[in-house]
């Protein structure tokens, strides 16, 4: 808001924020220091835009309309790899054209862990944290590229961009420093912070954290576009000559921060955006889906699709599959040109309402309240909300097996799924499959761990043929 709008009562009135106007005037008369503090926060708001986005999001959520089969259809899915993509991806890495970007703003609260998720240690041999595991994979991708293209410049690197939130920033940066950036040159690690949006009550009024502070929350993974621009990360990519960026969620323990095959596919097809998916098999599975709508890709939540569309099937090579089966696993490819354009249009992203229990300060009663039930909304934008700006011809939907690509760490051990134990088992099982595929000998109960320092995707294990492997770590 500009100075003129700040004291225009009609703007506060038409956007249901009179309590904010009244509090500003109260502090202006009674406490100038607190007034300036609150004023500085209000100046960051565009009340008209916020109110419009809130009303649109509210209307959409109340409408609760289900999409029919005529409104959404399957995207063309790439589910087999061209053998040339691996080498093409390694070539782009060797040329210094590739960067990794991790969305690491989440806390480990649901894991029973007091810290950023990326700092969580899985209990594998040598006890690496999630961040360290990803660093090992980045270094291995670079080593493979250098070996495949030894004539390229030796000083090339894979820069790692790490999006943190206000609550994870300090601890994440300290963790990297304490661990010497896990062997990656610190000049190749770029931390940047996602933005925040104000919390609202059920009627759309801004909530207060104190008498002179608004209640804020991270703005969702869609905040990546604006944050890349404002932090200087995009300028850094441009300076380095980055053309290809893979973005992923920190909590997928099987993730490949830089996947040569995926990058090779996107490079060969000259795509603006691509995403990895896994096949949805159960119509009742609660997962977002990549679909085509009006010749544009988009992600829809399971709750937005009619039962008829959810259960629709098609026959592929004599086997029945769900028609809408491309399940989103939050792993995306972006061309640098797309990110540049997206960063300039981030203000057009819609907001989504997450109903939560939000402690707040009541400026009328002057009491701080901790609610027992959900009382308001945290506002989020989603990274995939800009996907519809891309034509299906410039978008790639790449289907990968769950067992090799997706094992999210979401819950504590009290939950039967997506917990620490399931993640460790998935890592060990994948390594075991590589050993057996290469002719190694294992007992059924063996717990041998194949480190990313040894193999990224099962390559370079030919030496193990005919050898007995037992409960060890392969480096």
Curated annotation (Swiss-Prot):
Substrate binding (motif): residue ranges: 103-106, 301-302
Keyword Phosphoprotein part of the UniProt annotation: yes
Location(s) in or outside the cell: Cytoplasm; Nucleus
InterPro entries noted in UniProt: Nucleotide-diphossugar_trans, UDP-sugar_pyrophosphorylase, UDPGP_fam
Binding site for UTP: 103-106, 117, 194, 220, 251, 378
Catalytic activity: N-acetyl-alpha-D-glucosamine 1-phosphate + UTP + H(+) = UDP-N-acetyl-alpha-D-glucosamine + diphosphate
Family indicated by similarity: Belongs to the UDPGP type 1 family.
Record-given protein name: Probable UDP-N-acetylglucosamine pyrophosphorylase
